[in-house]
């Protein structure tokens, strides 16, 4: 992340990787927003390092503080979006997504997949072919794949 030439600076282009290393799971839109805030905040900082493609620890810290301050409303919005997506896969509101649900959505989208592919999707999300996956498992796999 840091280089020998700039040991006290981190590349802005690596902000998402830095956030993941710190235990965050940011969406691309949030990373872009944080990058913009870092760049915009520089005009107010005395002693700015002068490297436009880099950030220092203070800039990262300030960005993390603003992320944490806004976390609840952003998290609520993401949860609402994921819940809406879950309902698209669970039209009967059973609380689970089954292989049959995945097949139905694939058919609606014009996708042709083998049965083994649907089974693998359910297993990858932590479910089994008989019971499918619940909402929490759906949320977790969506976050892992960076779709939310």
From Swiss-Prot:
GO terms for molecular function: calcium ion binding. InterPro entries: CALM/Myosin/TropC-like, EF-hand-dom_pair, EF_hand_dom. It comes from the Eukaryota. Residues 77-112, 113-148 form the EF-hand domain. One of its GO terms (cellular component) is centriole. Keywords: Calcium, Repeat. PROSITE patterns: EF_HAND_2. GO terms for biological process: centriole replication; microtubule cytoskeleton organization. This is Uncharacterized calcium-binding protein R08D7.5.
């Amino acid at each position: 992340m840091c280089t020998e030439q700039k040991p006290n600076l981190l590349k802005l282009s690596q902000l998402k990787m830095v956030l993941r290393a710190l235990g965050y799971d940011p969406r691309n839109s949030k990373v872009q927003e944080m990058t913009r805030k870092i760049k915009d905040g520089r005009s107010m900082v005395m002693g700015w390092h002068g490297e436009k493609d880099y950030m220092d620890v203070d800039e990262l810290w300030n960005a993390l503080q603003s992320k944490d301050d806004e976390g609840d409303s952003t998290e609520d919005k993401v949860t609402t979006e994921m819940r809406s997506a879950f309902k698209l896969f669970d039209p009967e509101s059973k609380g689970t997504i089954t292989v049959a649900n995945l097949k139905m959505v694939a058919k609606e989208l014009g996708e042709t997949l083998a049965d083994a592919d649907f089974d693998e999707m359910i297993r990858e999300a932590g479910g089994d072919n008989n019971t499918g996956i619940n909402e929490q498992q759906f949320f977790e796999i969506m976050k892992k794949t960076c779709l939310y």
